[in-house]
Curated annotation (Swiss-Prot):
Cellular compartments annotated: Plastid, Chloroplast
UniProt-listed Pfam families: Intron_maturas2, MatK_N
GO MF annotation list: RNA binding
Role, per record: Usually encoded in the trnK tRNA gene intron. Probably assists in splicing its own and other chloroplast group II introns.
UniProt key word Isomerase: no
Family the UniProt entry places it in: Belongs to the intron maturase 2 family. MatK subfamily.
Protein name: Maturase K
InterPro entries given in the database record: Domain_X, Maturase_MatK, Maturase_MatK_N
GO biological process, one term: mRNA processing
Keyword vocabulary terms for this entry: Chloroplast, mRNA processing, Plastid, RNA-binding, tRNA processing
Length: 506
């Protein structure tokens, strides 16, 4: 961390626009390489596949110093990537290095803000996805209405660049950034503008996630300002940024918005009981007051996206429902507020009264149908939930096959242990268990019954149901009453940093 600060201070002292010169400094690429392979607790590069080595980076820098280093002729695209260089691969390496360099100053800004707030030690737990659900349990039981919001994607990459211009005042830096986008659009000239941003996010995940995070931060900073101005109470918010928890809490240091720009708007929002939660591109807004106010927030979001960010959004992308009657889908769970009614008899002198007590409780359930759909997509079962053999794994050893299935089952059980009802989770485990048995039987060219009778693997496959109990017994007292209570209650883990493909089925 101190090395980054030293190098940044050195270049900042030379000139104000320091980001562009950083890109052409060899020591920065060495730091970026080290930074990527020795990640601190603040950095999550989910889905990023680093295919470069330090030797490739050094050769790249040598070419970048040469004249016309960014001009690549069309004939170069046919070169052997081992003898010469491939145009697409060359651009990919520059794009990845460019994104790493851009992240450095914002990473320093984040770490310094966390140190000032003295929350560095507890930051590891705050990063967990499951830490959102205790927040929902504490706050949402007192609320009545929930708004399910899906943040729209910009239809053009230039919108993301324009948002970044509020923070970075470096013309050369933006020329190079637009070069990447222009090179991408020319390389994919047959792709429509609507699909271009989706394709860019897959081919340049690191750079796209950085730009997208800035877009979401800008939108949330304005929302946060309006919320704080419309109430004297402190905003209760919790957000985990899109695939990169790297940007957690950066909304504290975003563009300052002045009250005079929203003087007429603030009169519409007077809601002291409002809570906001977001993960990736989906957010939840909950309120205690009437749905009229929720509709005002809905139209505010639509106009904000259309007028300020030039992003078209249909009113149908925001759904407003009553918590006691509808469930909302968030982070792989179905959640709603359940009303538990009980009648208490009270007697005063000779008069007897029946008092009805209503207790609200947040009910969090495993969504069985989307999970079966995800398992069917991965070829573990059909769309009806009947287990299938994973024939593509039949070439592996028996131990590897069982270990793969156990790992999937362990991850799902680990993630969905916060469910109020474990019945659906046990059904998913049962599907994976039978799929594992069918895969082993397929490998040995036998039927399921004959394979189990011959190998006696039935006891081994009981790990699908008993492994979680063994882990919990190491943490809690090993008594039947304790284990039964753990099966009924929710268990949230603070070491889950992102959801896997089977969970992320939204």
């Amino acid at each position: 961390m101190k090395e980054y600060q030293v190098y940044l201070e050195r270049d900042r002292s030379r000139q104000q626009d320091f980001l562009y010169p950083l890109i052409f400094r060899e020591y920065i690429y060495g730091l970026a390489y080290s930074h990527d392979f020795n990640r601190s607790i603040f950095v999550e590069n989910v889905g990023y596949d680093n295919k470069s080595s330090l030797l490739i980076v050094k050769r790249l820098i040598t070419r970048m110093y040469q004249q016309n280093h960014l001009i690549i002729s069309a004939n170069d695209s046919n070169k052997n990537p081992f003898l010469g260089y491939n145009k697409n691969f060359y651009s990919q390496i520059i794009s990845d290095g460019f994104a790493v360099v851009v992240e450095i100053p914002f990473f320093l800004q984040l770490s310094s803000s966390l140190e000032e707030a003295e929350i560095v030690k507890s930051y590891h737990n705050l990063r967990s996805i499951h830490s959102i659900f205790p927040f929902l349990e504490d706050k949402f039981t007192y609320l009545n209405y929930v708004s399910d919001i899906r943040i729209p994607y910009p239809i053009h990459l230039e919108i993301l660049v324009q948002i970044l211009r509020y923070w970075v005042k470096d013309a050369s830096f933006f020329h190079l950034l637009r070069f990447f986008l222009y090179h991408f659009s020319n390389r994919n000239s047959l792709i429509t503008p609507k699909k271009s941003i989706s394709t860019f996010s897959k081919s340049n995940p690191r750079l796209f996630l950085f730009l997208y995070n800035f877009y979401v931060c800008e939108y949330e900073s304005i929302f946060r300002f309006l919320r704080n101005q419309s109430s004297h109470l402190r905003l209760k918010s919790f957000s985990v940024f899109f695939e990169r928890i790297f940007f957690y809490a950066k909304r504290e240091h975003l563009v300052k918005v002045f009250p005079k720009d929203f003087s007429s708007t603030l009169t519409f929002f007077k809601d002291p009981f409002i809570h906001y939660v977001r993960y990736q591109g989906k957010s939840i807004l909950a309120s205690k007051n009437a749905p009229l106010l929720m509709n005002k927030w809905k139209h505010y979001f639509i106009h904000l996206w259309q007028c300020f960010f030039d992003v078209w959004s249909q009113p149908g992308t925001i759904h407003i429902n009553q918590l006691s009657e509808h469930s909302f889908h968030f982070l792989g769970y179905f959640s709603n507020v359940r009303l538990n009614r009980s009648v208490v008899r009270s007697q005063m002198l000779q008069n007897t009264f029946l008092i009805e007590i209503v207790i609200k409780k947040l009910d969090i359930i495993v969504p069985i149908i989307p999970l079966i759909r995800s398992l069917a997509k991965a070829k573990f079962c059909n769309v009806l939930g009947h287990p299938l053999s994973k024939s593509v794994w039949a070439d592996s050893s028996d131990f590897d096959i069982i270990d793969r299935f156990l790992r999937i089952c362990r991850n799902l059980s680990h993630y969905y242990n916060g469910s109020s009802k474990k019945k659906n989770l046990y059904r998913i485990k049962y599907i994976l268990r039978l799929s594992c048995i069918k895969t082993l039987a397929c490998k040995h060219k036998s039927t399921v019954r004959a394979f189990l009778k011959k190998s006696g693997s039935e006891e081994l496959l009981e790990e699908f149901f008993t492994e979680e109990e063994e882990i919990l017994s190491l943490i809690f007292p090993r008594t039947s009453s304790t284990l039964q209570r753990l099966h009924r209650n929710r268990i949230w883990y603070l070491d889950i940093l992102f959801s896997n493909d089977l969970v992320n089925h939204e």
